[in-house]
């Protein structure tokens, strides 16, 4: 169809519609207002696929994150020379059932991270409700955190802390960057369930489940 003819037909159709419908001035004003609002949002919205630049204070991020209850674990590891270390962590995720995998998030500054990478294995110790002191011990910068903590070395060569609810031993499957942390996916080698009540972290304090 000739585009000029199409424009004439379209214009005539709009004219006929306005003559038949005859909207009030109030309705026209409302429609114009809606169109202006739509155009305003269309011009300011962030296009899909682009990253919005919003400044969020780290303190707010931490405060909001602290309102998410989580279990508390100590991740233990051993390097190829037998050096042991560990760290306290709440960022533990049961990632997959088939195959069985867990994910942990380790700060890039952690002294335990290079040990995990070197040994290629780690153990997740789920702390019990009576082990808040152990959580604090492994959250410290001490280089010999296991010295004052009762534990045994498993058949996989990793420390399992006495009195924990459960332990999960994993082989490192993959490591990927996650901001100022590294995300480590582990294939489950062994699980030991000892029972008991788990330690919970909520609002920057340790709690027990009643």
Tell me what each language-model feature is:
Residues 2-210:
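Basic, polyanion-binding surface patches
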């Amino acid at each position: 169809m000739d585009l000029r003819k199409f424009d004439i037909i379209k214009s005539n159709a709009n004219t006929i519609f306005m003559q038949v419908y005859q909207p009030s001035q109030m309705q026209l004003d409302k429609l114009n207002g809606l169109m202006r609002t739509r155009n305003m949002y269309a011009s300011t919205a962030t296009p899909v696929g682009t990253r919005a630049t919003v400044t969020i204070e780290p303190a707010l991020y931490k405060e909001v994150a602290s309102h998410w209850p989580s279990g508390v674990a100590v991740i233990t590891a051993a390097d190829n020379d037998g050096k042991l270390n560990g760290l306290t962590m709440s960022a533990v995720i049961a990632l997959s059932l088939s195959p069985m995998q867990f994910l942990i998030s380790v700060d890039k500054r952690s002294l335990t991270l290079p040990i995990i990478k070197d040994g290629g294995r780690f153990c997740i110790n789920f702390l019990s409700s009576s082990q808040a002191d152990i959580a604090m011990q492994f959250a410290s910068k001490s280089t010999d955190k296991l010295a004052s903590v009762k534990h045994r070395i498993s058949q996989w060569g990793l420390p399992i802390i006495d009195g924990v609810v459960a332990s999960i031993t994993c082989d490192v499957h993959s490591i990927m960057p996650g901001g100022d942390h590294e995300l480590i996916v582990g294939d489950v080698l062994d699980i030991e369930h000892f029972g008991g009540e788990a330690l919970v972290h909520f609002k920057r304090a340790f709690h027990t489940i009643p």
